[in-house]
């Protein structure tokens, strides 16, 4: 590719509305342009990267035995009603009607469509297992699209779906997909971890996320210091404290706290250790519980894990917090004065709260708190559950080492769905015994466009993007200085360009009439890994300058050796 025949579209200034570095650099490098909130046009440089990611994903899916299909983005609403997700999915599901008033959705995922397809095509256990994949546009009507293509409304995704008659068969395919995903991200030179995860709205019995480690990541990932345990913080179990509850040493007393409406204010004003305080959080109760609200208690220095809390049978799904008006209508006090003593509601306490003694909490009267609360003496111990997020230093759930926490960007997710969709949609095959059997399913997703942004978050410096070779828009840039004034510079540039192309190398020849500084800045910004600078002065000694974008090192290479040298440097 020649720059004179290419749309480079680089920007010197960082757009004001770009929050994270990947969004900033994708705009500045001329990879994307915003069309509307959460909607982006991919420009030539962006498309080249996107296609390389897509090709690696496709190759490894094929290697793992998956079969490519293509399903419509527009899906009939009745399939979503049949699966039960029409009501469950919420406003992220964009719904519309056609001219005949028939309801449809823009597909955020394709479990319903593939299940409908397979129940009409497969009728015998002898035809299974099968694994189908597609690389296709998805749409989710995000309430607040942000971070560029990291959380866009329209995005490119690889989704795969497998069908089985036994759990053992599903596990084999799940393991194969786990290995394929690992190979995909290894080929892209990404620093990633596969972690245990919650199944979320997709459902199922087991899942792993593939997280690219980056400070800008939205997810907290926990790791053991002494084992291979790794999980999303939403999933990680917080073990019960090993030490028994201490003996009570204080009397229960009620204290005036008119200016302490938060844990931080309570701790500061009364010199109370935060570990001796309890937060009482009110959420809406399940309608079958007989109550409007449920109280959830966590230690003052801990955070409620909403994913864990939502799984409690007495909690309404999805989990929603009560408003101050709702709380006052039942308790007669505001959110800053709540506690477990004399609380006329169901209470669930975290494991760490269950072993506390002599602790402080709201008195369910505005401006008052109880200090010196003790279980079994002042009130019975209520239901105990794991309700909190783990913190650094907690014992690892597998009992080996302690936990560390890092930030991650989710780029892939695999699920063992079981029979959630196949049972709801009556997707059966004839089993070995001649009886109809509900198929067992797995599903496996990779956010192809999100991978591009995640790679940038992990590979950049103050000058721009530093692409891994495998997904760079161009592997080599040829930068001839004043080629329009020097015949021999132009001749070598053209010869090198033709030879590299004949070797299957993605190369860009900068044949613009631009100053050297502009040429260097553009190639560094778009992240070309290998750069060759051809100048008259160096040609006097039959040399060219090679610069590696990642290492930043320059070295002189003989013109007769440059092709072999580049082929040895490029990771293919």
UniProtKB/Swiss-Prot annotation:
Say if the entry is tagged with keyword DNA-binding.
no
The alphabetical list of record keywords is: Aminoacyl-tRNA synthetase, ATP-binding, Cytoplasm, Ligase, Nucleotide-binding, Protein biosynthesis
Recorded catalytic reaction(s): these are: tRNA(Pro) + L-proline + ATP = L-prolyl-tRNA(Pro) + AMP + diphosphate
Q: Which GO terms describe its molecular function?
A: aminoacyl-tRNA deacylase activity; ATP binding; proline-tRNA ligase activity
A single GO CC term for this protein reads: cytosol
Q: Where is the signal peptide?
A: none
Q: What is its EC number?
A: 6.1.1.15
Q: Can you tell which superkingdom this protein's organism belongs to? A: Bacteria
Compartments (UniProt record)? Cytoplasm
Pfam families attached here? HGTP_anticodon, tRNA-synt_2b, tRNA_edit
The family classification in the record reads: Belongs to the class-II aminoacyl-tRNA synthetase family. ProS type 1 subfamily.
**Assembly state and interactors?**
Homodimer.
How are the domains described in the entry?
Consists of three domains: the N-terminal catalytic domain, the editing domain and the C-terminal anticodon-binding domain.
What does the UniProt function comment say about this protein? Catalyzes the attachment of proline to tRNA(Pro) in a two-step reaction: proline is first activated by ATP to form Pro-AMP and then transferred to the acceptor end of tRNA(Pro). As ProRS can inadvertently accommodate and process non-cognate amino acids such as alanine and cysteine, to avoid such errors it has two additional distinct editing activities against alanine. One activity is designated as 'pretransfer' editing and involves the tRNA(Pro)-independent hydrolysis of activated Ala-AMP.
The family database entries (HAMAP family) matched by this protein are listed as: Pro_tRNA_synth_type1 (MF_01569)
What name goes with this protein?
Proline--tRNA ligase
């Amino acid at each position: 590719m020649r720059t004179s025949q290419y749309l480079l579209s680089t920007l010197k200034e960082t757009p004001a509305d770009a929050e994270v570095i990947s969004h900033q650099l994708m705009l500045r490098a001329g990879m994307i342009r915003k069309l509307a909130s959460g909607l982006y046009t991919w420009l030539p440089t962006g498309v080249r990267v996107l296609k390389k990611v897509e090709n690696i994903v496709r190759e490894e899916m094929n290697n793992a035995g998956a079969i490519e299909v293509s399903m419509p983005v527009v899906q009939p609403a009745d399939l979503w009603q049949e699966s039960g997700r029409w009501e469950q999915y919420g406003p992220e599901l964009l719904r519309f009607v056609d001219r005949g008033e028939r309801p449809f959705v823009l597909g955020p995922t394709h479990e319903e469509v593939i299940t409908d397809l397979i129940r009409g095509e497969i009728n015998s256990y002898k035809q299974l297992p099968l694994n189908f994949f597609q690389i296709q546009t998805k749409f989710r009507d995000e309430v607040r699209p942000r971070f560029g293509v990291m959380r866009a409304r329209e995005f490119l995704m690889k989704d795969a779906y497998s069908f089985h008659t036994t759990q053992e068969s599903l596990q084999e395919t799940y393991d194969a997909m786990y290995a394929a995903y690992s190979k995909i991200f290894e080929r892209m030179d990404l620093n990633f971890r596969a972690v245990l995860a919650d199944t979320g709205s997709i459902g199922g019995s087991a899942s792993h996320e593939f997280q690219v480690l980056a400070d800008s990541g939205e997810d907290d990932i926990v790791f053991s210091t002494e084992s291979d345990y790794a999980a999303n913080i939403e999933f990680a179990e917080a073990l019960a404290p090993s030490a028994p509850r201490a003996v009570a040493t204080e009397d229960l007393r009620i204290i005036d706290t008119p200016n302490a409406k938060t844990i931080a204010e309570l701790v500061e004003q009364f010199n109370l250790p935060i570990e001796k305080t309890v937060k009482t959080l009110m959420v809406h109760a399940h309608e079958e519980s007989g109550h409007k609200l449920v109280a959830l208690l966590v230690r003052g220095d801990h955070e409620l894990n909403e994913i864990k809390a939502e799984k409690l049978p007495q909690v309404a799904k999805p989990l929603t917090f009560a408003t101050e008006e709702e709380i006052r209508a039942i308790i007669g006090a505001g959110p800053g004065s709540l506690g477990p003593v004399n609380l006329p509601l169901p209470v669930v306490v975290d494991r760490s709260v269950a072993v506390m003694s002599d602790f402080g909490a709201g008195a369910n009267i505005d401006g008052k708190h109880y200090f010196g609360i003790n279980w079994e003496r002042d009130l019975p111990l209520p239901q105990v559950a794991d309700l909190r997020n783990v913190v650094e230093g907690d014992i690892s759930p597998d009992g080996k080492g302690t936990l560390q926490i890092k930030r991650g960007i989710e780029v892939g997710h695999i699920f063992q769905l079981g029979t959630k969709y196949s049972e709801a949609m009556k997707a059966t095959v004839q089993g070995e015994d001649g009886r109809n059997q509900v198929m067992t399913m797995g599903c496996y997703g990779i956010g192809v466009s999100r991978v591009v942004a995640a790679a940038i978050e992990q590979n950049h410096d103050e000058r721009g993007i530093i692409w891994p070779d495998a997904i760079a828009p161009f592997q080599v840039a040829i930068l001839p200085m004043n080629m329009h004034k020097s015949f021999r510079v132009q001749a070598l540039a053209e010869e090198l360009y033709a030879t590299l192309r004949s070797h299957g190398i993605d190369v860009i020849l900068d044949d613009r009439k631009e100053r050297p500084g502009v040429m260097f800045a553009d190639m560094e910004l778009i992240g070309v890994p290998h750069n060759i600078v051809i100048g008259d002065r160096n040609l006097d000694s039959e040399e060219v300058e090679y610069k590696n974008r990642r290492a930043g090192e320059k070295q002189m290479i003989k013109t007769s050796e440059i092709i072999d040298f580049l082929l040895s440097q490029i990771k293919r």
